Amino acid sequence: MRTYGVFGPPQEFPGMQKLFDALNHRFDADLGPPAETIDETATLKSMAARRSHRRFKPEQLSIELLQMLCATALSAPSKSDLQARDIVIVRDKAKHARLAEMVGQEWIPSAPELLVFCGNNKRQRQIHEWRQKPFENDHLDAFFNPAVDAGIAMQAFVTAAESIGLGCCPISGIRNNCDVASEVLELPEHVFPVVGLGVGWPVASGHVSVRLPLEATVHVDTFKDDAIAEQVEAYDNRRYAIHHAANQRQVERFGEVAKYTWSEDKARQYASPERADFGAFVKSKGFLLK
């Protein structure tokens, strides 16, 4: 039986069985209930079994529902309570269409709702002007904190939305051409797009993406990756047996392989530059990144 340093062996605990079934399937693990008493597991079950959705019913959500979900998302942690993140709800059809065209993923035009989570360092600088205090943190952290804050808010939105039955799919491709996204959304200096999100009532459930084993990604006290090559190989084999990509990347450059695994896909993906101009865009927004 497999064990993990911080996790004990599985135990009999029928009320949490679905949660641990989902976790153990995703991570190929033998996790069991903790010693602590946990009465409510609905959110945990939803998160453990989550999957991205790219097919939706056509109807839009009410603005009231979107505002409720945004408020819930913005209740998530924020570095030093700086609240350096904003959400743009894209309801204008022309803007939606232009962003979808820029990203280039065929499912996005049919997503009923498109949101863009932005990092915002402008507001902090404005506060310094209003309070007549010098802004002495014009370095990498001025960009990094809003970027992380926006990512946290996006994940909180996903958790909230999926808890009521909505489906979501994050869109990193919103950064494929940040100049276009910034123009469409009229983002000022020191405000930048971090991630998009397609949202709607799902019509089909996507597959659950199994993850790397916890031995590879959860560490106790010290980071260790002595066995990472073997762990990735085992993960490749398991993932390929469950679900693997239908299309191979860059066949003209790397050819076709009989067994197209996760690591092969990721190696091919990052064998070509992606968003190499993102740093220049961020600097054009007024960030020094020093």
Regions found by a protein language model. Give the residues of each.
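Acidic, surface-exposed loops and disordered segments
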Residues: R2-K290
